[in-house]
């Protein structure tokens, strides 16, 4: 089972789409896009994604991508690394 990373389409329009596309090309991660993840305050203030249900944030797309991989590693989420 691979880590699941979920994105809000509104947040993707603010820049997390770059991260979505990079993760979509990683065969060891499952990614999903939703219309809304019900985190509107967070969505308005930063880039974020849900990683196996946990909120992971970043100030830039590169920060978000780095933080997602770090969260996966720190939490030993399956066989990614």
Swiss-Prot record:
Give the signal peptide as a residue range, or say none if absent.
Answer: none
Q: Which InterPro entries match?
A: DUF1450, UPF0349
Its family remark reads: Belongs to the UPF0349 family.
Instruction: Please give the name of this protein.
Output: UPF0349 protein SERP0525
């Amino acid at each position: 089972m691979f880590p699941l990373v979920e994105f809000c389409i509104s947040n993707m329009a603010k820049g997390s789409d770059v991260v979505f596309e990079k993760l979509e090309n990683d065969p060891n991660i499952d990614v999903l896009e939703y219309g809304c993840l019900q985190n509107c305050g967070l969505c308005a203030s930063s880039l974020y994604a849900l990683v196996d249900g946990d909120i992971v944030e970043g100030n830039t797309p590169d920060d978000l991508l780095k933080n997602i991989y770090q969260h996966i590693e720190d939490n030993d989420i399956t066989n990614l690394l």
